[in-house]
């Protein structure tokens, strides 16, 4: 931006002249182009305004492409070796096949390289993005820069992206590596991800489309983009195509088809052409309506006159070309363009160099553009193809041909055809009037009537044909001519050059690129054009530099200093925060800034400044009798009256220049004399009125000149007044800053006082003034001034914030009338209070508008006292420094600080240069390492998990009778489908080990099995099975210690090989006889429930008992091996063996203990008989042994013996005893122990009550109580009325009111509290604390408990507590002051109590347990959801037979189920329930609607079912929003199903009318899950309703669940919920665990409680902070092992403080960021938001946990949102740990 532009008027009612601007970017000539009047006109031409490309041959821009074309470059070469390496390793045959596959073509050297950090993409995500996405993203950015569009400015715009794509090599590479598939790979490798990634990164709101039309894809994309623009669907289009050759598959296909040349070269039109060379790269063009482009000052590169797309229909083969189709599509494009074929000068052909394709295409093009067009033989049409230069880019080929055609039109030349030696003899070149150039050809000179035109053809092997017609822009030559008239390097006017980068380390490279370009083009460029390009048409990133330069050599030298990080006074640098700085505020300072030649330079060189001076000259002449112009030219005398007037003139003149460069201010303030200019610039006065005030007052000052003096003293105004005391003749005139003020008064008095204070060590500096400004000595001038101004001033309301330094309230809106200026003259200047108000209002950027800075230091000091935020205070001019450069430097400082200067609006017609260097990329390799073995080869070396054994690759050991099986075991290939945890470690079930033995041996018999050490699944380990004719052994070792010599191999299990002729002891069992002698019928779930009770939380296999009978020593169970058809099992045997070992361990259920099998005497299987899915398992105790030993037999349903497991012995695990482990660790209730009281109570200077009812009788009592304690208070009906800025220690107490309707009470109170929090956070009032008072008895207020807990988690800095009080007329000050960090406090017996989870105690036997009767009906809301259907299935297995499933959605008519909806999973679930014997009614009733209760009653009467005995309310929706974002609509939508639904059920089924009333709530509210404000409120209401019904004698209970694995919130695809659970200190549970917990609660009658909290606390690390206080009594942790001399990070042993602590924390936090994002620590920018570095929601949770475990301090769920950068986090933890 240049300081020499002409003037602009202030944004005020000031008088002035119109702006004078430089000429606009040409675009005025539209001859030959249709410019429609209507935006939606379908006839509109489309302009190409930007292009970018990256191709082989090191082509990285259209300019470098043109140079490459001119030299007939051929970029063909060999495939980089690493590309196909994963395929070479996948199969032994692949190496030979790849050797036969063409490995030559046109390749990018750095296809794996990408600048992920620039786009804030984490390395983890970057490597999962197809290189095509990365390439397209970078090239699209370059194309926008080439178009002169700053990409960030498109955010939210109707900009579309159309990208052609046809290759999915990377997707195949990644997605076929199944064990390593990751969530990011979906969009990361999809075709749609290529345009969508661009739209996402740039925040574009227009269409985003990927097109696959094979090799025509990118030209088809351009066609659709053009159509969308013409139809008005989009304003701007990014169109192009991309191709990457990463796998051998398609190359092999094309080899087989004979389409590829053996040497990988393209030879279009050449006799030797025998196929094409595949190529990779990307091309992008930017399209806009021509009329809009001209209006926006864009450079029109060419006009896209017409385009067409078609198909070649049915040919000899789908890949065979069709000349007629190619001809027709060309004619269609010409018709669209409305130009004749003979006007086309050049055709860019598809020309794939195939023997059939080239002649076919050339003949078709000749028919259209050659001889068939009727053109003269002397005017042939030139034809060419870019493919021999850069290869056939397939999906990117069309757009690259288009870019070449645009370059041909712009240069008026056709480059020579590469790789053309002998013309193809199959083409009639002598007759067709098409000419492929051998040398550079210059096209005929175009004219306005006959502009140059070109056509582009592109075809796909699938049959798509496309064509485009281009025309040279008629204004191009005019533009070039006018650009040449712009002054170049010798223009002396200074300019501002802006460079920036998203990270600090990039700035040097950006500066280096610009320096090199300037050096190479010094003689031909205009520095002004470079300035406007950088300011208006480039993105402005976080790290900013601004250079003030007045010549190209000056700029080059400054850029060199930037590159070297050398100091330079005209180089400004800064980094901005994540949001734009608020401001700027212009400060007009007062008397004292003057110097003799202060305005001379500006008057001579700035038209804007000169205009101000000439406007003021007549007034100054008339009013004070001297010439301002003459004074500027000769020098300003040191006379107070002249200084006053000239200072005002300088203020307005500098402001005029500054507004041209940086735009208008956001606010203004004047200091003393400066208030006059502030009034003018704000619009409160015209410039004439401002001049009258200053001139007439200056004239009066002449009476007092020489009678006064002023001195700056380094003490505060308050101290100065105390020191002055009763001394006369001296007053405090200016309150400048907290440590300084200005004294004014009589000359002698000032001198005496100054001398005395200096002797006392106080700094005193005399001010250049001989008038006693701002003292009572001026009172005699008051009346004359008032009279002289009365009637002359007509003050207005300012048009921007105007602060006062004359009024006690700096925000006073008093009009600037005559009385105001009297006050301004006499009263002290309150600069300090005005600056404090500016800081309080959030302004952080301030500019001192003066000829020399005199208040900057004071302003910096005051701002520093008011805020810890970064602050900018900059001068506009400095004495004896170049004025224009100084003002530009101020603009540069504002920009670098982060003020949003709209440069393009300041000078919209400024010329610009697209050749200015674009973004410099900092590439790093990102390429996903995949498993280099195929699925088949993996099976050769590892076990098959679905075989449910550990047999890997079989190796016969030569020279021995031994056989070895070896495998690699890890979590991903565990040989069982479920989970089998033991003390937190996943172990291989004994059944799998036994099956492994049986599978390895030919005689299916093993004996003397010893199960010695469990085989642990994770971490990964090697497993070997060795056997000979006598023994078989399983051994294992961790992968990292797998050498045989180091003794790390464990013997896990051994056995002897059984004899070949061993058979079961019996062939058949009489099952009917067994049933008769086993009289005790057990529940089908008996074994599972028992095992759960002793600590087995999950099963390795999905077997299920369907019939179970027993006696004291014997059991018979009918078992289904796989009732739900779970995958992961090739047969049923191992699942049934697992059932056998599990069920037989329950024979000793009367002595409960977790028992594991330790040995087996013999296992024998009848291998001739296939194992059915359903078997009977017979277990009997072996009485002759002291151990727990059983014999087990598996039989078919007819009694045929299938297997015997004889003498299986069990032993209890060391330290295990019966304690109902599973449910005691799972089922809890909330108890309320006394709260700990702090020693340093909170102090409140004021308490503000907020309540809808200000007549609430409690208020009078509370205020009386506070009056007695001398604490002030106030009452407010709305949060917006709170006095947040008036008190430093404010307590806000919300008193919710009760309304007639319970739902209205709940929603109103929650909305009120949300509004309070939003108001306080918006005001950034961190010293305010919020409390809520309830009596705990009002049902509608119970929702507030859940909301309060979420607020505590999200805003712990302002949350006090929700307090349930006993005495509603006594303010609970003790709890408010002495209990800290509590979300909810309950006062009972006068004691503040806090919530803690404790195990649910057993209840008395008199309570009714939960039972399901076949004769009753049960109702489930949310019944068609996954949770509801799972509950329904469990209830049916427990005896329920009649179910009502309520849901908001209706199922299709049952008559259509069998035909159309058999794959509907909901319908399948219902049919499964019916197969189990249940009658299911699905009722489409939205239970939250007002009429739901009556509708449900009516439906129940109609169905005529047995009475409803139990209700489960499981309906609900989730809409996560932070409290700051919650709206009333969202809150009500989430609360309705929970609260209205529950109340409707409460109405239909009143208390004591049911066997049970179960409400599904959530534990998320207790643990403060962020974002769940609405959901938590609804769930807390359910808890309150259960409490209310229980109080009325009902068997109601609220179950506060953790997530159910795989259901509801437990289905988070990206693992966010699992990570959040872990962060909060708990885990999810399986549905089986949920039902066992429910059964446990029901079996105790709920323990007499109205709720049960069903969670499992995870085991914490030794030094890990407790994730939430509510877990205090149930959390367990591992012992912390610390080596001697070591201390945990963040522990009190590390005695650091100050800068040492800050550096330690920065290192720790950077390490955690590095670990989370997989980024190097030296690449982390501590000022960049972690989200902008690519940290998503799941990573954020993991980062919090890493941080918490490293620092050993709690890290709240919203801390990362409030402290978004490393810088913020360091500051936060420094304060916390220092405290």
Swiss-Prot record:
Gene Ontology MF: a single term: fatty acid synthase activity
Alphabetized UniProt keyword annotations: Methyltransferase, Multifunctional enzyme, Phosphopantetheine, Phosphoprotein, Transferase
Pathway the protein acts in: Secondary metabolite biosynthesis; terpenoid biosynthesis
Annotated stretches, region: N-terminal hotdog fold: 948-1064
Enzyme class: transferase
Region of interest (Disordered), residue spans: 1-40
Region (Product template (PT) domain): 942-1218
Ketosynthase family 3 (KS3) domain mapped to chain residues: 43-472
Keyword Methyltransferase: yes
Role description: Non-reducing polyketide synthase; part of the gene cluster that mediates the biosynthesis of yanuthone D, a fungal isoprenoid epoxycyclohexenone that acts as an antibiotic against fungi and bacteria. The first step of the pathway is the synthesis of 6-methylsalicylic acid (6-MSA) by the polyketide synthase yanA. 6-MSA is then converted to m-cresol by the decarboxylase yanB. The cytochrome P450 monooxygenase yanC then catalyzes the oxidation of m-cresol to toluquinol.
Skewed-composition ranges (Basic and acidic residues): 31-40
Catalytic activity: 3 malonyl-CoA + acetyl-CoA + NADPH + 3 H(+) = 6-methylsalicylate + 3 CO2 + NADP(+) + 4 CoA + H2O
Domain topic, free-text comment: Multidomain protein; including a starter unit:ACP transacylase (SAT) that selects the starter unit; a ketosynthase (KS) that catalyzes repeated decarboxylative condensation to elongate the polyketide backbone; a malonyl-CoA:ACP transacylase (MAT) that selects and transfers the extender unit malonyl-CoA; a product template (PT) domain that controls the immediate cyclization regioselectivity of the reactive polyketide backbone; and an acyl-carrier protein (ACP) that serves as the tether of the growing and completed polyketide via its phosphopantetheinyl arm.
InterPro entries in the record: Ac_transferase_dom_sf, ACP-like_sf, Acyl_transferase_dom, Acyl_Trfase/lysoPLipase, Ketoacyl_synth_AS, Ketoacyl_synth_C, Ketoacyl_synth_N, Malonyl_transacylase_ACP-bd
Protein name as annotated: 6-methylsalicylic acid synthase
Biotechnology: Yanuthone D is an antibiotic against C.albicans, methicillin-resistant S.aureus (MRSA), and vancomycin-resistant Enterococcus.
O-(pantetheine 4'-phosphoryl)serine PTM positions: 1737
GO BP terms in the entry: fatty acid biosynthetic process; methylation; secondary metabolite biosynthetic process; terpenoid biosynthetic process
Active-site residues annotated for this sequence: 215 (for beta-ketoacyl synthase activity), 350 (for beta-ketoacyl synthase activity), 392 (for beta-ketoacyl synthase activity), 672 (for acyl/malonyl transferase activity), 980 (proton acceptor), 1138 (proton donor)
Domain (Carrier): residue spans on this chain: 1703-1777
Phenotype caused by lack of the gene: Loses the ability to produce yanuthones D and E.
Segments of this protein annotated with the region C-terminal hotdog fold: 1079-1219
